[in-house]
């Protein structure tokens, strides 16, 4: 059975982290996109563990710090959610755990 692809919006919050724990335990899903705001160390950890293809960081300072990592050169790292729809269209499941986003 093919793994389903998942996008987690709000990956560093409590619901996002719970979602990622389930993903890690089930082995039925592949996280391909994470969206987070300011939790620098959590974002770094999630990138290392889940190896998403796309990381969107809302906070400009955190985005700039993570963008400098040479290890993450193959990642698509964005600071703008304006065109997020084009990435979400390619994902099987989207978990929206961001307050104010439906």
Ranges and model annotations:
Residues 26-28, 70-73:
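Short helix-capping segments at alpha-helix termini
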Residues 35-37, 58, 97:
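Conserved residues at the C-terminal ends of beta-strands
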